[in-house]
A protein has these predicted regions:
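Conserved catalytic-core segment of nucleotide-activated headgroup transferases in glycan assembly
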Residues: 144-196
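Nucleotide-activated donor-binding/catalytic signature segment of Leloir-type glycosyltransferases, i.e.
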Residues: 192-216
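Donor nucleotide-sugar binding/catalytic pocket of nucleotide-sugar-dependent glycosyltransferases
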Residues: 101-136, 146, 150-152
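Short hydrophobic beta-strand element within catalytic cores of glycosyltransferases
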Residues: 245, 249-252
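Acidic donor-binding loop of glycosyltransferase active sites
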Residues: 220-234
Length: 315
């Protein structure tokens, strides 16, 4: 099969240099299409003509609309949580709905978005993980678990908004007197400058702009991943799957319709999160095994194979 993914543009590097999400997904799918023996390319929308490929896969709403105008059939994959946050009267929702309506099929990485868009072309398609890049190391149950959060915080133009739940993770660490690391891009400085109380915790370690090449080592230096997010386009999102692949049991909040073995589901409630922490510590080996199994199931090689089946059904 001849497959082309549309480059997301807007200054985004594919393959990704450092922090990123869409560009990582595009690149991993590309590599795994090739691994399955398909022809795969990544091109800008303006470079694609009708009939050039068997399938054109677009990850950005306005670029999908551009393909419509060029007469290029496409599969659309939505990644933008703002379409939900701003509501159905917003420009971003209408743009993504237009991209869906003009597609031959549309994919969303969360089941709540299937219901939200309520369109017959929309189906759930989970994110994946490169298990060669992220993998576990042997680790016995720690006496004092080191907690880890990895995220780019903020919401809808407000970079200090605690969408990712840093305050809950730090409060959990304080309540149990445990070390915690919060890692992400420099954008997270806005959160800490607006939540100065967090900086008073002596066991808090903050890392900005960690290169991708050092991310696996960061996971291996920690024991439990904390992710009390309030809004994600992906359930599970990429960092949850990365943490699981690296062998970290997880305390997180994600949609109830999606099963994720190896994680304890807790709302944004420090006391409920503490219960999850206790359950993980009491069943350490079981959580480690289950999160590893989840990561293997979600390997990008498997996700690419499933995606090709979807292509074959609609072209």
């Amino acid at each position: 099969m001849r497959i082309c993914q549309v480059h997301p543009a807007c200054g985004i590097d594919v393959p990704p240099k450092d922090w990123g999400a869409i560009e990582k997904i595009v690149w991993e799918l590309h590599l795994n299409f090739l691994a399955h023996g398909h022809e795969s390319e990544i091109k800008f929308a303006t470079e694609i003509n009708p009939g050039d490929f068997d399938v054109v896969h677009c990850h950005v709403g306005n670029l999908a609309i551009m393909l419509q105008e060029q007469g290029v059939p496409y599969v659309f994959q939505l990644h933008d949580h703002h379409a939900y946050h701003y509501g159905k009267d917003s420009h971003v929702f209408r743009e993504n709905m237009k991209a869906i309506e003009g597609s031959i099929a549309s994919l969303v990485p969360a089941r709540y978005l299937v219901d939200y868009f309520d369109h017959p072309k929309v189906q759930y398609f989970a994110h994946g993980i490169n298990n060669k890049e992220f993998y576990p190391v042997e680790k016995s149950k720690p006496k004092e678990p080191k907690l880890l959060m990895v995220a780019n915080n903020g919401l809808a133009g407000n970079p200090s908004f605690d969408r990712k739940g840093f305050s809950y993770g730090i409060a959990l660490a304080q309540a149990r007197n445990l070390p915690i690391t919060v890692a992400g891009p420099s954008n997270n400085k806005h959160f800490f400058n607006s939540h100065l109380w967090t900086l008073a915790y002596s066991k808090l370690n903050i890392i900005f702009d960690l290169p991708n090449s050092k991310l696996l080592n960061l996971y291996h230096q920690h024991d439990i991943f904390i992710h009390p997010t309030m809004l994600e386009a992906g359930h599970p999102n990429l960092t949850m799957i990365e943490a699981a692949a690296a062998g970290l049991p997880i305390v997180a909040d994600w949609e109830h319709e999606t099963v994720f073995h190896g994680a304890w589901r807790a709302p944004r409630d420090v006391f409920e999160m503490a219960k999850g922490l206790d359950d993980i510590m009491n069943n350490w080996d079981d959580y480690r095994q289950r999160c590893s199994n989840t990561a293997q199931e979600l390997d990008w090689f498997n996700r690419a194979e499933e995606l090709v089946k979807i292509y074959q059904e609609v072209i």
